[in-house]
Amino acid sequence: MNASLLHGMRPTTAGAAAVSTSLRARAGPYLVCRRWALIADLIAMASLSAVTLYQAGLLRHLPDPPMRGAASDRVAASPAAYWVLHAPDAALGIVSYASTLLLATAGGADRYRTTPWLSQLFAAKLLGDGLVAVVLLREERRGGNGFCSWCLVASAAALLAAPLGLAEGIAATRVMRRARAKR
């Protein structure tokens, strides 16, 4: 048995150490985009955290900016906001953005070569998040109850992040095609 496990320490591998260094110390266009996507996801999660607190009864009111149509309380308390799994939709959004956050931080700077499927999954997830944001914005507009300013922040963050994984996803696809062609 590994002695480090007996002392409550996690075993380390050269690969994990390389990823740690790569994420923290390296640069590159794909890593920069991943970092911006990470920031956008954290903004979306922070915004949805306030909505979740309201939807769970821990806040009595969600303040809105002085804008026409702003009605965060009404939108966040609507039956539509509890439709999926009968759970607050903001909490589900946080879970979704947390998975995007994980994909943004998994793997080193060159993961498009080492684990191309991860880069492709990240690109697809960002595009999916952007698509969901568009659908939710459309539904909020159709609902006629006004809009949730907190939810708009999350949607804007998702839309800004949506294209950030494309270049890495395309590079990963090229790597996979070259590998198949060599077989």
Where are these regions (language model features)?
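Short amphipathic, positively biased membrane-proximal segments
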Residues: M1-R183
